[in-house]
């Protein structure tokens, strides 16, 4: 993607607005936002400073991030490990600008979030791409090993994976750790969906793997954890020396993040585990509702552990395996917007899968399923 290109998310959302379609494409919730977070932000706006906060982030939020990961993932961190950024994407950018030198090769795993490739390129790096193997979307470790060359300096990972929702196991991360140690590689892991896991699969961060802990960067997002994507509050977590390098790039990107939102995120991360469990249960029920409706209509939905998305296998569903063409037809003819999974590929795309977002009201999901079922019936 060039800097002037429109992303597939903006394209499909624009079509949805223009055509009055249900938007199951772009990943944002259409549900009531957490009142606790709104109230915390309002208090902070009225009672606390609205001037520049510290460049690395408010100490309270950095400490809250460390405490949250200690509680939920058993990571031993302090505020010195945390750099607050304006969203997870800025954390990715600051990290890659800190880690990549011109000519460095960086391994990317596709399907991938669309920011990875341009950020590597803007840092002067050269991307080498490894593909997950559908329909289980497994990471081929042998292909990863073969891709490592004398110019390889790092690997970008994503768990849970957007768009397909699969997760990297501890065993897989340990194997990656052995490769990283052998070749002196850094690992940048996009973990923004870590709180959105619905089947009991444990989320494992590279920071929890001894061979990776000192050479990895973890990217997180308050927008995803609290389902408030417009807040754009994120963070990078790394060993102090790595964190300092990332901070050096962050200061020339956004410098800092709105303080009221940082205060609110800090309060949110300290909420009891029951709050987070209730949020997951709500989304788990919405996912089950969409999946059961799609399956009843004859669509084959692939298993996924996390994220806000489900993936339809087009060929297995008896549909034409051209996801770009089908997604355009769906938004225009069925009035339901989706995202073609091929849009998440840098090269050699898989074209037989569509991504749908389930974080919508039950009635909206039911209406979308009815429209998709009618479209499928018309195809015969």
Model-derived features: where do they sit?
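N-terminal small-domain helix-loop-helix segment of the aminotransferase-like
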Residues: 2-87, 94, 143, 270-271, ...
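Helix C-cap/helix->beta junction micro-motif
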Residues: 19, 123, 182-183, 297, ...
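Conserved PLP-anchoring active-site segment centered on the Schiff-base-forming lysine
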Residues: 98-120
């Amino acid at each position: 993607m060039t800097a002037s290109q429109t992303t597939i998310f903006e394209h499909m959302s624009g079509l949805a607005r223009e055509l009055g379609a249900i938007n199951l494409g772009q990943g944002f919730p259409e549900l009531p936002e957490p009142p606790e977070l709104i109230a915390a932000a309002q208090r902070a706006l009225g009672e606390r400073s609205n001037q520049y906060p510290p460049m690395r982030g408010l100490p309270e939020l950095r400490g809250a991030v460390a405490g949250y990961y200690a509680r939920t993932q058993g990571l031993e961190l302090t505020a010195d490990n945390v750099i607050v950024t304006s969203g997870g994407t800025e954390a990715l950018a600051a990290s890659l600008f800190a880690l990549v030198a011109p000519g460095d090769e960086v391994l990317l795993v596709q399907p991938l979030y669309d920011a990875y490739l341009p950020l590597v390129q803007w840092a002067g790096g050269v991307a080498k791409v490894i593909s997950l193997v559908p329909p289980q979307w497994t990471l081929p470790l042998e292909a990863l090993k073969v891709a490592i060359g004398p110019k390889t300096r790092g690997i970008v990972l994503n768990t849970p994976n957007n768009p397909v929702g699969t997760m990297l196991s501890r065993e897989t991360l340990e194997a990656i750790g052995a490769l990283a140690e052998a070749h002196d590689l850094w690992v940048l892991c996009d973990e923004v969906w870590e709180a959105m896991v619905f089947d009991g699969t444990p989320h494992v961060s590279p920071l929890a793997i001894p061979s990776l802990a000192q050479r990895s960067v973890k990217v997180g997002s308050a927008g995803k954890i609290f389902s408030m994507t417009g807040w754009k509050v994120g963070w990078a977590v790394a060993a102090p020396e790595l964190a300092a390098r990332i901070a050096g790039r962050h200061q020339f990107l956004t410098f800092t993040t709105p303080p009221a939102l940082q205060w609110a995120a800090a309060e949110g991360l300290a909420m009891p585990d029951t709050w987070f469990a209730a949020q997951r249960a709500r989304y788990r029920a919405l996912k089950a509702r969409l999946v059961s409706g799609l399956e009843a209509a004859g669509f084959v939905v692939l298993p996924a552990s996390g994220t806000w998305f489900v993936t339809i296998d087009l060929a297995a569903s008896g549909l034409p395996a051209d996801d770009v063409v089908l997604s355009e037809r769906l938004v225009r003819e069925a009035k339901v917007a989706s995202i073609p999974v091929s849009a998440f590929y840098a090269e050699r795309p898989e074209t037989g899968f569509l991504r749908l977002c389930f974080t919508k009201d039950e009635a909206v999901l039911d209406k979308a399923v009815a429209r998709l079922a009618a479209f499928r019936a018309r195809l015969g």
